[in-house]
Amino acid sequence: QLLTVFTDITCSEIKPDVTQEQIEALPEFFIQTASALKDDSYNKWEKEFRIREYCPYSSADEWADKLMTRKYGDLDNPTGIYVNEGDEVVVLVGNTHGQSISIQNIGEETSKGYAQTSVNGDIYPLKEGVNKLTAKQTGMLFVMYNTNIQNPDAQPIKIHIPLGGGKVCGFFSLKEHQTNEKYKELIDKADYKYFCVIGNAIILYFHHKQLKAAVPYDILSSIELWDNMIQWQQELMGIEDVYPKQMNNHIFAISPEGGYMWASEGRIGFVYTVLGDILRKSYLMASRNCLLYTSDAADDRISV
């Protein structure tokens, strides 16, 4: 019945000759989405994060073993949609190309008396077509699509989380959004406790309020700072030929509400009171005496 109105099972586009009568014959849940698509009233910001193609990422566990390092993060595909406990969410999945895919709900955990982002959460396997899940806790939804990225079948997978399922918070992706102006627009709209910034090599999953106070506008210099440091580390390790052709996971950074700075399996932590320190290159170089890797058109050099 859905395919009498929509062009495919993700229900992200409707057929051009669809009538209102056909829309009203749909199951009640899908009428709102079909109507919004037909009359072009689907909020552009909501639509950007509810209808997306998710790219494949390597297995962080597998590559930690191969490279004999600690594990990179595996939360490489944030949806920009969060849920509250008890929320029911419909997830519409397109062609999976024979790949395994799931959604993970990442909430908070308590460590040594303070809150921090959990390293993992409830996982809901997905299949092609209509999937329904009920959230057991408040958290951000991440698509888990980890596979051999050199496999020809490791293709992007289209997913639609229709209106009424969770709430859009959004995220900033360097690859997609590119400008400081877009970052400001997105972080200003966000209303969840955490906000996600995706660089080429690092993901910053930090407290929204503290991140916005630390970097109200110039996020590009912050991303460049950390992407460059990770690139330098990879060159020192001799894995620059592996990353990102064979292994493409990000370093995943969180902002615990206690402790200080640390690195562990799957994530690194910076207590949320120091975000203004670690996201400003000038401060790191002047006050932290940090050794930084910088690149420019003329040369690659180490700066102190």
Enumerate the predicted regions with their spans.
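Juxtacatalytic substrate-recognition/specificity segment
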Residues: 187, 192-295
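Beta-strand-enriched, solvent-exposed domains that form extended recognition/catalytic surfaces
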Residues: 4-170
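Single conserved hydrophobic/aromatic residue that forms the stacking wall/gate
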Residues: 293-304
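Alpha-helix capping and helix-coil boundary motifs
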Residues: 27-28, 178-179, 215-218
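Low-complexity, Pro/Ser/Thr- and charge-rich linker/hinge segments at domain boundaries
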Residues: 160-196
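A signal for specific C-terminal beta-sheet/loop modules enriched in small/flexible residues
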Residues: 113-125, 162-174, 212-236
